[in-house]
Amino acid sequence: RKPGGAGPDQPAARARAERLPESDAAAQARASTDPVQIGSVISEEGRRIERPRRERPEVPEGAELVREVNNRFIFRTNNTYFIERPREERFIIDAREVYYEELPRSRQREVVVRPDGTRIVTIRNRWGDVVRRVKILPDDREIVLVYVEDDYYDEVLEWRDPGLDLPPLDLDIPVRDYILDAEWVEDPEDYYTFLDQPPVEQVERTYSLDEVRRSARIRDKVRRIDLDIINFEFGSAQIPESEIGKLEGVAEAMQRLLKENPGETFLIEGHTDAVGAEVANLALSDQRAEAVATALTNVFDIAPENMETQGYGEQYLKVETQEPERENRRVAIRRITPLVAPVASSE
């Protein structure tokens, strides 16, 4: 049923429940009738360049750069603020080498070489949107993390919400099976069981990371864990040392999923309460998401390339109030793998 709406009649509910995807592969079944052929991200010849400047070279039509805050850029598009970082600094910590190449059609390739020879290769389009990301192991085996289909590879030309082409989400499961509140988790196994579930509806195609970040409608295709057990102080993105242990349950679930599929991608979302300026809250929420991702890497050895972070400020309040509210100062986690990579690439 639609969240907050009246329950449907039982026969209709059963019919829709039968259409719920039973796996990631089933969710992507309509995306393409042909097997996905993924070419190597390093096969295309590129020209070595210096590290790109922090400033974005171009901004899509309809988007306006509003401010730079703590090495983050805040844009306004369609009367909505959005924050992003020009590069994911978490990826290059302790790297043996990092280099950049210019590719045809105004694209750039970033290669991060780890001490053991593993390479993280990311291709961005002219706006900086991630359209390909692959982890290449020392034995040259490639693990696809992000893959935008060729039909859309060069068409991610503007910041248009792909969710505008979809009807409202018609949720066919109880909300408790769609959003897991960490505060009520008694058995850590619940984290794994929850994250392992497929999307709640069909995935029309694979999306770029930035399309997923910017579109609530696309993100809502997958389930969400609200980590409201991590208590952020007002105005702070720092995780108190006493709170880090609370990440253990979800970290173990992520480790288990990554052992089964090293190509998993998790989105860490940051949120704030409604106190303060909207732009400042956006930057703070992004820092909170990054703080959790960093802790998951430093303490629990979750590889940084398997996590994406995004702050949403006060856009999605858990408790509708303009007053200080600890429950709104939170992070959330989704497994977005079936949204950004073909299932066949990880099997």
Question: Where do the model's predicted regions map?
Answer:
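Periplasmic OmpA-like peptidoglycan-binding domain that tethers envelope proteins to the cell wall
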Residues: 242-244, 264, 271-347
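Solvent-exposed coil/turn segments that connect beta secondary-structure elements
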Residues: 78-80, 88, 115-117, 124-128, ...
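N-proximal, low-complexity, solvent-exposed accessory regions that precede a main structured/catalytic
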Residues: 1-98, 139-200, 204-205, 209-211, ...
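Soluble periplasmic/extracytoplasmic beta-strand elements of cell-envelope proteins
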Residues: 72-76, 82-84, 109-111, 120-124, ...
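Conserved nucleotide-binding/hydrolysis modules and their immediate coupling elements
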Residues: 90, 94, 98-118
